[in-house]
């Protein structure tokens, strides 16, 4: 799940995520992450309309609240279907929030679905951000960077568009064999690490809570004859198994600052 040949990565993204957008748009699926839940359970107050997405929202909430976003200029790289962007704009009150994604269909969906003051969506590449230097106070990236062919280039771009003192708020996973290289890339980035922690347990718990919702989505988007196979071999199912203690995947949450 978390490693693809770099030569094919962006082609895979363009096909899979555009296909997913077309299939899931009518189901109002605005979050694509696995979810997150703590023990004891988090007490994040949500509106009735947000409640069905609680566990995906909680991953955004936990990642984004590592820094103050009120009154800040925020960029999210890999914004997916825009649910996290909408939630953070409504609750953390940044001055502006820009969601960027490589999937043009996803960006068009975001523009139709999320119409809020200060929120905009842009099609673009994480490894070549279409913004001037020092444009943002914070950059958010959640469960997306494992697909970038040149992760170190992405980190350099993050540092470039951040103002001095700005924050990079980040959560993602890597296969066990890739963790060492991941950590080296992060250590070599032109950013200072503020905090890091493993969140395998919390993500697995969130996935458990999200199970029925994702089964519903799969059933609605998949022909009946294929539903059993898709459920068994869906990436989320494999990731859930890989996130077990001592398993094949390590999921971590980070906060960095630009000095």
Feature-to-residue mapping (PLM):
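Conserved beta-strand signature within the Rossmann-like core of class I S-adenosyl-L-methionine
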Residues: 166-172
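Conserved alpha-helix/loop element of class I SAM-dependent methyltransferases that forms part
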Residues: 38, 53-70
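Conserved Class I S-adenosyl-L-methionine
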Residues: 201-259
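A short glycine-rich, Lys/Arg-flanked "PGG" loop and its adjoining helix->strand segment in the class I
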Residues: 152-164
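Class I SAM-dependent methyltransferase SAM/SAH-binding core
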Residues: 75-77, 81-128
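N-terminal auxiliary segments of SAM/dcSAM-dependent transferases
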Residues: 1-31
């Amino acid at each position: 799940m978390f490693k693809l040949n770099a030569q094919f990565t962006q082609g895979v993204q363009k096909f899979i995520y555009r296909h997913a957008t077309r299939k899931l748009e009518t189901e109002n699926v605005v979050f694509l992450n696995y979810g997150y839940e703590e023990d004891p359970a988090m007490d994040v107050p949500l509106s009735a309309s947000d409640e069905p997405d609680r566990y995906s929202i909680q991953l955004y909430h936990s990642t984004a609240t590592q820094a103050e976003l009120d009154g800040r200029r925020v960029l999210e790289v890999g914004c997916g279907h825009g649910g996290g962007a909408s939630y953070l704009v409504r609750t953390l009150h940044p001055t502006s929030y820009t969601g960027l994604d490589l999937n043009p269909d996803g960006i068009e969906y975001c523009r139709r679905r999320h119409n809020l003051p200060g929120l905009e969506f842009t099609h673009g590449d994480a490894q070549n951000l279409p913004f001037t230097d020092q444009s943002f106070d914070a950059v958010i990236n959640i469960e997306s960077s494992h697909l970038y062919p040149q992760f170190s280039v992405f980190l350099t771009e993050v540092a470039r568009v951040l103002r001095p003192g700005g924050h990079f708020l980040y959560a993602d996973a890597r296969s066990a064999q890739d963790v060492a290289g991941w950590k080296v890339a992060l250590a070599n980035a032109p950013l200072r690490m503020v905090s890091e922690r493993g969140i395998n347990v919390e993500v697995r718990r969130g996935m458990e809570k999200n199970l029925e919702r994702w089964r519903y989505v799969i059933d609605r988007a998949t022909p009946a004859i294929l539903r059993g196979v898709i459920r068994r071999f869906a990436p989320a199912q494999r990731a859930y198994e890989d996130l077990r203690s001592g398993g094949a995947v390590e999921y971590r949450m980070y906060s960095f600052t630009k000095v």
